[in-house]
Amino acid sequence: YGIIGFHLDRGSIKKDAVKLQEEIASLNNNRVKFWNENAADKEVMLSKMEEIKTILDNGKVKLLMHSIAFGSTTNFFNPTPVRQRQMDMTQHVMAHCLIYWTQTLLENNLLIAGSRILGLTSEGSYKAMEGYGPVGVAKASLEAVVRQIGWELGSKGITANTIQAGITPTRALTKISKDWEDWVERTKKRNPMKRVTTP
């Protein structure tokens, strides 16, 4: 399968993203295209649609994966109360933009029977935790978005689901809490295989 993706990386992290893109290209005969742009931005999405269609060359999107880990990691109240624009941004980026991507791909006849839509969720969708207020709300919203997509598009043979892979030691995890390493260790203890998901 070819892979089309977006990432939003700056500075030294950008080099890691380029390296990963090269690794992926070496595995799938160079059938890969990534843009270092904000996938949650409507203008970016619309501006890439014609290029996506050209890359697909009359093909269709087999899998739409929503894996955007960018939101406000704070509490609702103390010590740093969340602001409305932070909540709105987190909701849009981590949940609502999947609706607009799905709509746009449908409008461009790029999703068909057999297409799959996946979103990555977390236990924060049903469990309160330090510094996870806005993201937890967004994860619960993402699950509701995916349920509704599945209900509306199921008759077209398009399925939608979320995956809760558990604690995964990524750069995004380190931004959520200074105690992220403790989270990883606790997760290993309760996992029968004594491990966590690897990125």
Description of each model-found segment:
Residues 1-66, 70-85, 174-175:
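Short-chain dehydrogenase/reductase
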Residues 7, 164, 169:
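Nucleotide-sugar donor-binding loop of glycosyltransferases
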Residues 17, 134, 155, 167-191:
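A glycine/serine/threonine-rich, flexible loop-to-helix segment
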Residues 39, 167-168, 196:
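Hydrophobic pocket-lining residues within nucleotide cofactor-binding pockets
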Residues 65, 118, 160-163, 173:
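Hydrophobic structural elements of the Rossmann-like NAD(P)H-binding subdomain
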Residues 69-155, 167-169:
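Catalytic loop of short-chain dehydrogenase/reductase
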Residues 191-199:
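A conserved structural motif in NAD(P)-dependent oxidoreductases
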